[in-house]
Amino acid sequence: MDIIKSSFDKRQSVQKNYDLIAEQYSNEFGTYIEDLDVYEKFEQHLVENAKILDLGAGSGRTYSYFNKQNYEYIGLDFSKKMKDCAYNLHGKFPYIVDDMVNVKRYFSNNSLDAVFAVYSLFHLPKNDFNNLFSDVYDILKVNGLFLFTNQIGQGEDMADEPYLNEKGKNSLYMCYHTNEEINDLLHSFPYTELFKKQKIEISP
């Protein structure tokens, strides 16, 4: 019970903080596509009319890319205020407000062509992170695609978030994973790696 309660509290703190900064975040990132080459490479492997789930959809920047194509896009995020920002920017589209750990409440096994999780999974505590890989594997169709980002490191901490500083707070829960941990996790399922990109950011 302690682990579940602890994990819930950490996820809930992230949700509350994103509600606080939703408008500022949306203004800066609502239509901004970083690493466009990754999106394009991912798209090369998508089937026609693919059904895509975006875990941690935020203010809809992934929707702003895939809406231009003939795909069935569904967003999922635990921040109601992020959903409101997404609708203000892009108009209404399928968007579920809930914690991504509950994804199997909404999708049956073998029902999705692709799952997209960019800049979101590193807010999950390690046990939830690992369990999500199992859930995603279940809901993907055979030869389905899973694109995700990871913050390389070890352990967990409360990372500085400038937007929160403006709200009288200053940190956001983060959980890190080494490349070895990710590889072990992928190999514990029959996931096949198609491509990866590693970015190294050097602070001044």
Question: Which residues are covered by each model-predicted region?
Answer:
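Acceptor-substrate binding/catalytic loop of class I
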Residues: 163-180
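A short acidic, Gly/Pro-enriched loop at the edge of an enzyme's catalytic core
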Residues: 106-115
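Conserved S-adenosyl-L-methionine
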Residues: 191-202
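Class I SAM-dependent methyltransferase SAM/SAH-binding core
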Residues: 59-103
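A short glycine-rich, Lys/Arg-flanked "PGG" loop and its adjoining helix->strand segment in the class I
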Residues: 130-142
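Conserved beta-strand signature within the Rossmann-like core of class I S-adenosyl-L-methionine
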Residues: 143-150
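Conserved class I S-adenosyl-L-methionine
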Residues: 1-47, 49-56, 154
